[in-house]
Amino acid sequence: MAAPVVDAEYLRQVDRARRHLRALISSKGCAPIMLRLAWHDAGTYDVNTKTGGANGSIRYEEEYTHGSNAGLKIAIDLLEPIKAKSPKITYADLYQLAGVVAVEVTGGPTVEFIPGRRDSSVCPREGRLPDAKKGALHLRDIFYRMGLSDKDIVALSGGHTLGRAHPERSGFEGAWTQEPLKFDNSYFLELLKGESEGLLKLPTDKALLEDPSFRRYVDLYARDEDTFFKDYAESHKKLSELGFTPRSSGPASTKSDLSTGAVLAQSAVGVAVAAAVVIVSYLYEASKKSK
């Protein structure tokens, strides 16, 4: 499919979609599943074959029925009304914007978002996403295939501070942290505590402690949340742009509108609603079980 024309109207619709995403995520407490949708759409990228990536293909049944994507049809359906109100936006952009907003609304860092991803109808083969039952070698195989680094692996794993696992989707059950709708560095703090009653630690989580290269980032992020936020924002941006080359030229307002003015506005709103999101989160988790 052709790349979208990112003109003034496209940017207006991105801004509108951002506002609607804030409202949806705040009212439904669905930040975890929106982050998971963004991750799983982008995380299929293969740097060698230049296939997969953040291209919106996860909206097709062929892909959302992959075992690793169980439950994500919920997020896809929740986003359809927003897509209808901002029809120029590609699904690829919408899904990545949803992940960015999910992090910010729950108190996490601002992740730079540049629009222009093209949609694809070509679904990658199953098996490109991480298997939670495996270890460090598997994590490197998956993330290096995307073109990402050890630091990216650990920083992005910190996204497990949001949400919980459900047995019908992953075979595992439980949240990683005490406040699964608050984005902070508690994932790493809990990881260093060892086994905690009621909290989840996947084999891939434990691998971060056992591998020396991974472990140094775990220790760093546990003691320095600011550094975690900085590194996470950089790694999330890289993930969200897999298979996409942001515009390097064109209207000066394209990048500045989204990376400066809009960021200031979204940050202010995000701080205001973060507390409310945490309060309502457990009610939503109980009723919807959205990861």
Curated annotation (Swiss-Prot):
The chain crosses the membrane at residues 263-283. K(+) binds at residues 161, 177, 184. The keyword Hydrolase does not apply. One of its GO terms (biological process) is cellular response to oxidative stress. The record marks 36 as: Transition state stabilizer. Binds 1 heme b (iron(II)-protoporphyrin IX) group. The active site is at 40 (proton acceptor). CDD domains: ascorbate_peroxidase. It is an enzyme of class 1 (oxidoreductase). GO terms for cellular component: chloroplast; peroxisomal membrane. It is a single-pass membrane protein. Belongs to the peroxidase family. Ascorbate peroxidase subfamily. This is Probable L-ascorbate peroxidase 4, peroxisomal. It comes from Oryza sativa subsp. japonica (Rice). The gene is APX4.
